[in-house]
């Protein structure tokens, strides 16, 4: 098990069922040292209000030895790469994930999807692209991976894509991993937990990475320090409370 999980949802996204406290308890039990809460951006129908994200600044940084990153899974809104995270939201958040979700951006042809994803990557506003292997949104894996390397953005391998959602993702996720490997980029693993019980579960992701001989040194979840170095390279100020994670 890796000690970092970068994608999960709380009861603030009303189709999820666990609280921040639930995730902290599970993290302690499972040996997770650092995790990010990434509830859906406000353009989703059941997502939190934007004030929810702004007020995440009141969260403690560390509880019982577990570090907590303040994040969002924003929605890609259009081909210009706009997302539903802006203004004061950025000031309160550590981690910006963004991806396609049908209620906000309907599936298009491969060229349009690729244009939208690359524009999002190039915007400088996101750290990770969520579930880029979704078969509902065909993309040019090579072009997206090369753009991600250029702009220091990681592509996610999402464990839930093989279990509960986005059926048929396996071949695409293998292609994503291979393209990132060839481009020399980063992958981020996300459990995409909607209950705390599945946080830190990456078994299906690891099968994909093993299948393409993906280099472990390019996986962000290997250690808290690796992930924090990545975020700091993107401009995040060092967080003193995380120094001993």
Curated annotation (Swiss-Prot):
Record-linked SUPFAM superfamilies: PHP domain-like (SSF89550)
Protein residues bound to Zn(2+) 2: 15, 40, 194
Record-given protein name: Probable phosphatase YcdX
Listed InterPro entries: Phosphatase_YcdX_put (IPR023710), PHP_dom (IPR004013), PHP_phosphatase (IPR050243), Pol/His_phosphatase_N (IPR003141), Pol/histidinol_Pase-like (IPR016195)
GO-annotated biological processes: bacterial-type flagellum-dependent swarming motility
Keyword annotations of the record: Hydrolase, Metal-binding, Zinc
A Pfam family the protein falls into: PHP
Names of required cofactors: Zn(2+)
Binding of Zn(2+) 3, residues: 73, 101, 131
EC number(s) on file: 3.1.3.-
Name of the gene: ycdX
Species the sequence originates in: Escherichia coli O127:H6 (strain E2348/69 / EPEC)
Family in the record: Belongs to the PHP family.
